[in-house]
């Protein structure tokens, strides 16, 4: 059965998915796992952490590259026909929603649920003077030497 294959217009932008926007959609799906009350609480915390890590790396690598293209006035559009400036606007719009969802999930869902399980996250404003002093000493003796360039 030889049927003719429809010719595809490979210049049609609707055939392509932007790599950066696709990665943000993936972040939304991971965040949805953090919001799923049917999952164990610590798994939800883990998914939230994964979402945050993906976003950090996304901005360090992908957004930095798009910003470079925008800064140098790259006029070449991707196959999806977005310019670097248009892509940045899309990225920031998606990210604003994503970060708001991330913080809402943390503050409104996970922290209260953790608290019910007697797992408390202390904010720096809740630290005692003794805790603050210990942390300063620990940072100076253990962390700073590792992260300080030679």
Describe the role of every protein-language-model region.
Residues 1-150:
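N-terminal localization/anchoring segments of enzymes in phospholipid and broader phosphate metabolism
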């Amino acid at each position: 059965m030889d049927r003719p294959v429809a010719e595809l217009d490979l210049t049609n932008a609707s055939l392509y998915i932007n790599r950066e926007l696709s990665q943000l959609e993936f972040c939304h799906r991971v965040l949805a796992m953090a919001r799923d009350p049917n999952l164990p609480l610590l798994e939800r915390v883990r998914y939230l952490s994964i979402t945050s890590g993906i976003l950090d790396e996304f901005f360090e690598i992908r957004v930095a590259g798009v910003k470079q293209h925008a800064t140098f006035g790259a006029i070449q559009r991707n196959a999806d026909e977005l310019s670097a400036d248009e892509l940045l606007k899309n990225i920031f719009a998606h990210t604003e929603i994503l970060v708001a969802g991330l913080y809402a999930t943390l503050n409104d869902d996970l922290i209260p649920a953790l608290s019910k399980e007697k797992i408390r996250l202390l904010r720096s404003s809740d630290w005692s003077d003794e805790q603050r002093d210990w942390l300063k000493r620990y940072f100076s003796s253990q962390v700073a030497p590792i992260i300080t360039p030679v």
